[in-house]
């Protein structure tokens, strides 16, 4: 289920809200989008019985969706949590397997920092094996940690619908900037 904020709100609830808003904006830009989930249910195979089998199946299905078209870009929305509650800010992780992943990550990070978080000094980071989908991706793939649910002030923002919309717009703007570099 991911991180849980001190007020009890689960990361997955915030993730889905931002992802819905991002999906809406990207479709308005005329892009074809596919969401790996549209509700609070895992996408694991029905024959996966144990929690471990369900998680593995879920990851493999997401990987299959990501790899289904060579023109796909994969953007995973998440929230961060850390024991130090003063940490804040969006940070984008990218797949080590394609140079385009770093370019996309940079476009999104710069967009969020310039449009929404002017004081954010975080930089993009190459994924390690701990982020399975990015580490094994053959397509352009990034994971956007939108903020820290462990920071009370940032968590309030992350739970706010208007802030979620602005976050989604900032991410979408970065994606469009990336796409425009590919069209040149």
Residue ranges and their predicted role:
Residues 1-9, 80-107:
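A short, glycine/acidic-enriched catalytic loop
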Residues 1-62:
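Active-site histidine-acidic residue metal-binding/catalytic motifs
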Residues 9-17, 53-60, 98-103, 158-169:
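Soluble non-cytosolic domains of exported or imported proteins
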Residues 20-31, 38, 67-71, 79, ...:
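Sec-exported extracytoplasmic/periplasmic mature domains
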Residues 32-37, 73-77, 91-94, 141-145:
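Structural recognition of the beta-strand scaffold that forms the well-ordered cores
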Residues 56-71, 131-136:
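Mature extracellular/periplasmic domains of secretome proteins
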Residues 76, 83, 122-184:
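Active-site-adjacent mobile loop/cap segments within catalytic or ligand-binding domains
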Residues 100-126:
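Active-site-adjacent substrate-binding region
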């Amino acid at each position: 289920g991911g991180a849980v904020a001190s007020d009890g709100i689960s990361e997955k609830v915030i993730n889905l809200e931002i992802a819905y808003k991002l999906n809406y904006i990207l479709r308005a830009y005329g892009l074809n989008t596919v969401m790996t989930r549209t509700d609070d249910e895992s996408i694991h195979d029905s024959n996966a019985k144990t929690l471990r089998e369900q998680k593995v199946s879920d990851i493999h299905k997401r990987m299959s969706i990501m790899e289904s078209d060579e023109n796909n870009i994969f953007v995973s929305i998440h929230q961060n949590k850390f024991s130090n509650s003063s940490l804040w800010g969006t940070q984008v992780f990218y797949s080590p397997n394609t140079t385009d992943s770093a370019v996309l990550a940079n476009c999104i990070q710069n967009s969020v920092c310039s449009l929404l978080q002017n004081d954010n000094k975080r930089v993009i980071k190459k994924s390690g094996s701990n982020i399975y989908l990015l580490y094994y991706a053959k397509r352009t793939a990034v994971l956007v940690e939108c903020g820290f649910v462990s920071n009370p002030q940032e968590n309030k923002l992350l739970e706010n619908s208007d802030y979620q919309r602005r976050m989604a717009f900032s991410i979408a703007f970065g994606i469009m900037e990336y796409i425009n570099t590919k069209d040149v």
